[in-house]
UniProtKB/Swiss-Prot annotation:
Residue ranges, annotated region (Disordered): 63-88
Any single biological process term in GO: transport of virus in host, cell to cell
UniProt protein name: Movement protein
Keyword Transport part of the UniProt annotation: yes
Organism: Beet curly top virus (strain California/Logan)
Protein purpose: Probably involved in the viral transport within, and between cells.
InterPro entries: MP_R3
Length: 88
């Protein structure tokens, strides 16, 4: 079974193959500088994340330090024997 392919589609297919091979060759040729750029970008993103984290924690410093009586009531709500001694 023969499939008729238009000329423009065939040329587009050939052009995409050439573009992909050229991109792969350029990426292999420039891999050193690309990896350096990616590592510098990664480190700058890490620094930005740390700065944002510091800003968030300085704006809400009491969020972690708040002693919620409902949370701390777990085992500490049971008296240690002071009531038992007074029930005589």
């Amino acid at each position: 079974m023969m499939v008729c392919l238009p000329d423009w589609l065939f040329l587009l297919f050939i052009f995409s193959i050439l573009l992909q091979s050229g991109t792969n060759f350029y990426g292999t040729f420039q891999s050193g500088s690309i990896s350096r750029q990616l590592s510098s970008l990664s480190s700058s993103i890490d620094q930005l994340f740390l700065k944002v984290q510091q800003v968030v924690y300085t704006r809400y410093p009491s969020r972690d330090r708040v002693s919620d009586p409902r949370r701390r009531r777990g085992l500490s709500s049971i008296p240690e024997g002071s009531e038992e001694a007074t029930e005589v």
